[in-house]
Curated annotation (Swiss-Prot):
Belongs to the bacterial ribosomal protein bL36 family. HAMAP family: Ribosomal_bL36 (MF_00251). It comes from Alteromonas mediterranea (strain DSM 17117 / CIP 110805 / LMG 28347 / Deep ecotype). Transmembrane segments: none annotated. NCBIfam families: rpmJ_bact. One of its GO terms (cellular component) is cytoplasm. It holds the Pfam family Ribosomal_L36. This is Large ribosomal subunit protein bL36. Keywords: Ribonucleoprotein, Ribosomal protein. SUPFAM superfamilies: Ribosomal protein L36. One of its GO terms (biological process) is translation.
Amino acid sequence: MKVRASVKKICRNCKVIKRNGVVRVICSSDPKHKQRQG
């Protein structure tokens, strides 16, 4: 899980979602692509 000021999709399987007011990126193909805005 990377915590970044700016979250971006890294690959085509990444999805940007908003969970409890926090913007996150989840990825089914590569767990290293997980990000959280903060």
